[in-house]
UniProtKB/Swiss-Prot annotation:
Component of the 90S pre-ribosome involved in the maturation of rRNAs. Required for early cleavages of the pre-RNAs in the 40S ribosomal subunit maturation pathway. One of its GO terms (cellular component) is 90S preribosome. This is rRNA biogenesis protein RRP36. The lineage of its organism: Eukaryota, Fungi, Dikarya, Ascomycota, Pezizomycotina. Associates with 90S and pre-40S pre-ribosomal particles.
Amino acid sequence: MALSGILSKRVIAHRADENELEDDFSSSEELNTLGSEDDEDEDEDEDEGEGEGDESENEEAPDNASSEDDGDNDIKSSLSQISFGALAKAQQSLGPLKKGAKRKHGSEEEEEEDNKNTKYKKSKSDALNELRERIRRAKEEKASKSEGSRDNELLDKKHKEARSSKHAPAVQSSKYAVSRRRVVVDGENVAQVKSRDPRFDSAVQSYSHNAKSSSYATSHSDLAAAKNYAFLNEYRDAELKELEEKLRRSKKDDEKARLKKMITSMKDRKRAMENRERERQVLAKHRKKERELIKEGKKEKAWFLKKADLKKEALKEKYESMGAKERQKGIERRRKKVASKEKKEMPRSRRMVEG
């Protein structure tokens, strides 16, 4: 089996033409005929030797040995000239060897190949193990370095944070190089520049107003914008009616919840705008009244409303403009709102007793 394997490998590497195969077979036949002629000559010599004496046998013995050596050399030379294709063809014609009939030479070659393979595998496994060991060591060194750097960073942070007071200047180690670019303003504490709309910007308006005179005062730019875009209130009212109509016609719960949320948001926004407008009117009336009193000489200095007083006056103005029934409903709603707010601020133990 080993010989057949070796022959097949060599046949794959060196394929011969059909003409070479025929020539090789003819040469092998000639060798066979030569071998048969040599055998006949040897038989004739033996017969002649039997008729002669012992002296002739001693003389012909070296001649026979030399002839046999010449024949062996001729066979070896002829076999060396036979191509691998002819040998493969002969092996195929003879058929494969049986399992138990292994040649000694083939078994030795297989053992050598097995030994080489095992040595190669061992060397490969050793190289892999060595590579894995190097990778493991490199990882350990990297982890130790990272841990050391983290410890150093923590120590540096602690050293930086340790100051006499929060107003003390920051301390920087002299080991670190100073940056060539000087930080004038810290970017984190600087407010980002926002885009400005000239329609609502007081700096672009044709008149100026000191909005810092009171914290709740409304600037003239806001008033001008409200006056210029008053038609948006009509659009909002139309949109609110449309949403209420959709809510009345809708049947899906998800759609109803979404529409209710939108309607509530729009109503709250509208109510907040009305309250702001009412407070502005109350504040304008109060300023006008104080200005007239100063002109008449009844007052030397103007009296400015506080936020709480302004809200009370605005609420009073709101209830005075309502009807009787609407005023009663509003007062009841206000009372419930204040009661729930007080209940939330009350401790839980008192809340349970009074509830």
